[in-house]
């Protein structure tokens, strides 16, 4: 199709190879051309964006992947959205496969809910809609004053399991922590496999029960209202590491939404190996892999790490052959087509469960 006639354009919000590659895959599936723009850093460190064609009255889709430099990527997206708004684009839709700061969506001690701040900034910059994938918390959608389509990668990962893992019927789906149990259960039910949960010291410590905002004064200076006796709480203590479920002689498939702490996945894999699992896979939507991740994965009992291309990880993939990529440009391009044409998005959620 001809993008100029249909009234929409697709732009890449930065010039990194990964973002440009994803944008090109999407435009090829749509039969459109990538919008002409220039995004670069000034010598003083400022980000500059120049739109090189008319966008007046068109639907504009901005593709932005999030590399290691998160803050620069956010500024690129904000400045490009504002430039398109100034150029009289009709609608500005951000295609952000991995939404940054999604782990800061709850109050922690004397911190802030940064994810809500970012949502407000995007709206102020001119975005009118967002397409993203597997938000860390579904409640994040409520931070926005415009529509958010939270697509899911589970159908692609389930297909990978069925087609690329030999003898997957002998596998068991594993939750790395009780927090991930619902997601793991959803995978296990659709694949008709068993379920195991790792509980104990290897679990994620994202929920911090010690909230510093309620720190009491020193006992000698404290004044207690007469008759007020607060119940005493037992100190939080992790139990010894335990695997709930049988993984002996089985293939263990650990599923989660984000891999950003490789050490915890390696620890989980070592535990599963000790319990008798003969092959271990790790699967997640977003692979936020550090510079040390390839070495840690290569030296671990993990046989394969499978992630989608929502986050750039080509360099890490070259360093570690265990890292595999699942392309999700198909669902992103279909979402763009449906939104532009005013079609229902229900088809994209037909195989999705509430726990995905």
Curated annotation (Swiss-Prot):
InterPro entries: Pribosyltran_N, PRibTrfase_dom, PRTase-like, Rib-P_diPkinase. Ubiquitous. GO terms for cellular component: cytoplasm; protein-containing complex; ribose phosphate diphosphokinase complex. The modification Phosphoserine is found at residues 177, 215. GO terms for molecular function: enzyme regulator activity; identical protein binding; kinase binding; magnesium ion binding. Transmembrane segments: none annotated. Belongs to the ribose-phosphate pyrophosphokinase family. This is Phosphoribosyl pyrophosphate synthase-associated protein 1. It comes from Rattus norvegicus. The lineage of its organism: Eukaryota, Metazoa, Chordata, Craniata, Vertebrata.
């Amino acid at each position: 199709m001809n993008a100029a006639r249909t009234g929409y354009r697709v732009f890449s919000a930065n010039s990194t190879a990964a973002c440009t590659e994803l944008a090109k895959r999407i435009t090829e599936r749509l039969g459109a051309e990538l919008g002409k723009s220039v995004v670069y850093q000034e010598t003083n460190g400022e980000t500059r964006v120049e739109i090189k064609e008319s966008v007046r009255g068109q639907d504009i889709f901005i593709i932005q992947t999030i590399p290691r430099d998160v803050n620069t990527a956010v500024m690129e997206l904000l400045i490009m959205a504002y430039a398109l708004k100034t150029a009289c684009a009709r609608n500005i839709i951000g295609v952000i496969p991995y939404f940054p700061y999604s782990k800061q969506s709850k109050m922690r001690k004397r911190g802030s809910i940064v994810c809500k701040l970012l949502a407000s900034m995007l709206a102020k910059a001119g975005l009118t809609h967002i397409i993203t994938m597997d938000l860390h918390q579904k409640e994040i959608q409520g931070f926005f004053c415009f529509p958010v389509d939270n697509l899911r990668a589970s159908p692609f990962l389930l297909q990978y399991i069925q087609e690329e893992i030999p003898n997957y019927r002998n596998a068991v789906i594993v939750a790395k922590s009780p927090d991930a149990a619902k997601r793991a259960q959803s995978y296990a039910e659709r694949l008709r496999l068993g379920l195991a949960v790792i509980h104990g010291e290897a679990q994620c410590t994202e929920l911090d029960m010690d909230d510093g905002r309620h720190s009491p004064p020193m006992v000698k200076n404290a004044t207690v209202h007469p008759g007020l006796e607060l119940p005493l709480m037992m100190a939080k203590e992790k139990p010894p590491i335990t695997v709930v479920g049988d993984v002996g002689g089985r293939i263990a498939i650990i599923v989660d939404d984000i891999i950003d702490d490789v050490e915890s996945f390696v620890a989980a894999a070592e535990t599963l190996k000790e319990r008798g699992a003969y092959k271990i896979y790790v699967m997640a939507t977003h692979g936020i892999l550090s510079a040390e991740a390839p070495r840690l994965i290569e030296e671990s009992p993990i046989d394969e790490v499978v992630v989608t291309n929502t986050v750039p990880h080509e360099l890490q993939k070259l360093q570690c052959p265990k890292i595999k990529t699942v392309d999700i440009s198909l669902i992103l391009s279909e979402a763009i087509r449906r939104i532009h044409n005013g079609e229902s998005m229900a088809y994209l959620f037909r195989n999705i469960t509430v726990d995905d």
